[in-house]
């Protein structure tokens, strides 16, 4: 008998683009900055250009990194920039039951195992000469056949099947990654009980019905993992687009909260939007208001990324 998909109710018919659902998923570790606005604007424009929905998700699954009040600041910034979202906000910190359900489904099929390795041990493993993803060494599978004597699980990992994952990025073109070789079995839950980002994102995208993920290029390395995990859960993968990062000219580092990027000056929303538009490689638009700018930008976006009809309906305002 064929195996039933774990979350089959979330399968999406990509032939019907009326069903477009995008999302913006900031982590509340600080306010939005110029780099995060580029990703927010691109995802908003793609949703509006496809006459779709734009969801907001607060990715506060890593509670120790959450800054009190930051989520409210982010929402206020989006409103000031006229980037209004559709429907209710999803909070990862309230989604433990959904993550547990997916985790249990994988565990029931023998796809989860406990790992007692420390980060140092993984870095010093026999595979230390192997190039990894995002600066991390691939997990060598030390605990795949069972924990060493005297060890307790520090994390729970998913068994990654062999093979190369291929996909087409709507901005960057064809991509591929051998997840088993480049990453290895990756963690879905930490010893402190916190859920890993990769599991949370896959489950949340499915539950929100997301058809298209538009985000910064720094997350490109996560895409193959998320596709593999989604397939193990019986989920159809969303289309992806990874847009350029904004770099600090003084340091050469990407603008990020960790690197001290300043918060957006939302008292000048039109100027902020124009700068983000420029960061996406577009020429400045002649617009006197944020609303006029967004209307014109969505029309150009539609022309560039395949929509024949550039007229964009006004988006509903969030509560």
Swiss-Prot record:
Enzyme Commission numbers on file: 6.1.1.-
Any Gene Ontology CC annotation: cytosol
Extent of motif 'HIGH' region: 26-36
Cofactor: Zn(2+)
GO BP of this protein: glutamyl-tRNA aminoacylation; tRNA modification
Keyword entries, A-Z: Aminoacyl-tRNA synthetase, ATP-binding, Ligase, Metal-binding, Nucleotide-binding, Zinc
A GO term, aspect molecular function: ATP binding
Top-level taxonomic group: Bacteria
Binding of Zn(2+), residues: 115, 117, 139, 143
Motif ('KMSKS' region): 254-258
Keyword Zinc carried by entry: yes
HAMAP family linked to this entry: Glu_Q_tRNA_synth
Family: Belongs to the class-I aminoacyl-tRNA synthetase family. GluQ subfamily.
NCBIfam families: PRK05710.1-2, PRK05710.1-3, queuosine_YadB
Biological role: Catalyzes the tRNA-independent activation of glutamate in presence of ATP and the subsequent transfer of glutamate onto a tRNA(Asp). Glutamate is transferred on the 2-amino-5-(4,5-dihydroxy-2-cyclopenten-1-yl) moiety of the queuosine in the wobble position of the QUC anticodon.
Name this protein carries in UniProt: Glutamyl-Q tRNA(Asp) synthetase
Gene name for this UniProt entry: gluQ
